[in-house]
Every structure is written in structure tokens, then in C-alpha cells.
């Protein structure tokens, strides 16, 4: 299984010739949906979902997401499946389990649904939340930036989930100086936990089990 990081919050996972894309938002300029078999979308914010790109994608593309996103994709009948906390399903040869219900607290007047996804019991992508799935997580895609996130919360999340490896996501708001800070934070915590925590550059891949 190969994981490739793209702009901001988007990743692409490939296995046995099948392609699964997570959160291809408007910050994602790379053509990540080309050749994709399925898409997982954690929530409705534009940096995680680009409705126009989904509508222009292959009609065979399968989309799994929360009710909030599905409501914006009603003109794609049959392509969109609503997922809720506790659901389990298979798509494009990947086994997926759903965890969580809500976006981390951001604006008090705008609650937003958010679903995290565990893929093949290997990769956990929480979206814009610090959801603890309560299961072993070999690879965590950890949010490292955003108006709803503090450094202390990120570190505590890494220590609670305690993954064997973690890669930065939700880092598209940083300039080069900010990304350097992310690298330092992850390196420091990696040494503390004796684990592999780091940031992948846009287009960089990692081979997983």
C-alpha cells in the first residue's frame, strides 16, 4: 500500500491497482481524481471538498461522506453514500471504518459534521477533529494546523493515539517558516515516543504495510 501526500489535507492511497482519495479540496491543485476509484470526504469545508471537481470526475467514482456533504451532491444520484460513526464498508478493495461525528470546536455558531476514516486497519484520517478511534493505529494522518488546533492539543493527540508512524496533514495554511515549525514539532515528538513522525512534501509517497 502506498500513500501520497497532496496539497493541504488531501492524500491518495493506492493498493493492487486501485486508488482511494481522501479530502480533495479546493487547495488541491494536483489532478488527484484522475484514475481514482473512490473518494472519502470527512466534512463539508471547502478545503476538504471541491464539489465542482467531484461533479466533473468519472461517473464510476464512488463517494463516501457525511450527510452535510451529501446534501451538496444531490445531483450525483447513486454515487454518494452517507456514512455515520460506527459504519464499516468496502470500496475499491479497501476496508473502511468510520469514527466520530463532529468537527473540532471552531466557531460556536457553526457546528459541522465530521467523519474520520480507518483504512485497512492501517491508516487513520480524522479530518478536522482529534477523534480517538480506540483501536490500534499503525499510521496516523495528524492535523498540524488550523484555527481550531493548538500545538498542545496536537501533541496530546499523538500521545493518546500512539501510532507507529504519523504524517502531517492540514498544513496548507503554512508558509515555509511555518512548515519548518511543523517539522520541528514532529521531530521532537517522534524522538519522545520513539516513533516515525514527519511531514511529507506535496507529491511525496510512503510505502506502508
Question: Which ranges hold each PLM region?
Answer:
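Core dinuclear metal-dependent hydrolase active-site scaffold
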Residues: 1-34, 82-136, 147-153, 201-209
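A short helix->loop->beta-strand "cap" motif at the edges of active sites that frequently abuts
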Residues: 18, 58-62, 78, 161-165, ...
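Active-site metal-binding motif and surrounding structural segment of the metallo-beta-lactamase
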Residues: 26-69, 138-141, 162
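Structural motif
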Residues: 20-21, 40, 64, 125, ...
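Alpha-helix capping/helix-boundary segments
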Residues: 46, 69-70, 131, 173
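Binuclear metal-ion centers of metallo-dependent hydrolases, dominated by the metallo-beta-lactamase
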Residues: 1-4, 77-92, 155, 165-209
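Metallo-beta-lactamase
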Residues: 115-188
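Short amphipathic alpha-helical segments and helix-helix/interface helices
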Residues: 10, 51-55, 70, 154-158, ...
Amino acid at each position: 500500500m502506498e500513500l501520497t501526500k497532496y496539497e493541504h489535507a488531501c492524500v491518495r492511497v493506492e493498493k493492487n491497482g486501485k486508488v482511494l482519495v481522501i479530502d480533495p479540496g479546493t487547495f488541491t491543485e494536483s489532478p488527484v481524481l484522475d484514475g481514482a476509484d473512490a473518494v472519502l470526504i470527512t466534512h463539508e469545508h471547502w478545503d476538504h471538498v471541491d464539489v465542482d471537481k467531484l461533479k466533473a470526475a468519472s461517473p464510476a467514482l464512488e463517494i463516501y461522506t457525511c450527510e452535510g456533504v451529501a446534501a451538496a451532491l444531490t445531483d450525483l444520484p447513486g454515487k454518494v453514500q452517507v456514512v455515520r460513526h460506527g459504519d464499516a464498508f468496502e470500496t475499491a478493495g479497501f476496508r473502511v471504518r468510520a469514527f466520530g461525528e463532529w468537527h473540532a470546536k471552531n466557531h460556536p455558531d457553526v457546528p459541522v459534521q465530521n467523519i474520520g476514516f480507518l483504512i485497512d486497519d492501517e491508516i487513520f484520517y480524522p479530518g478536522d477533529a482529534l477523534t480517538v478511534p480506540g483501536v490500534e493505529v499503525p499510521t496516523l494522518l495528524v492535523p498540524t494546523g488550523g484555527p481550531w488546533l493548538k500545538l498542545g492539543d496536537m501533541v496530546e493527540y499523538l500521545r493518546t493515539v500512539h501510532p507507529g508512524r504519523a504524517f502531517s496533514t492540514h498544513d496548507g495554511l503554512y508558509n515555509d517558516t511555518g512548515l519548518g515549525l511543523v517539522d520541528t514539532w514532529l521531530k521532537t515528538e517522534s524522538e519522545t515516543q520513539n516513533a516515525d513522525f514527519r511531514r511529507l512534501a506535496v507529491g511525496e509517497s510512503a510505502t506502508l504495510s
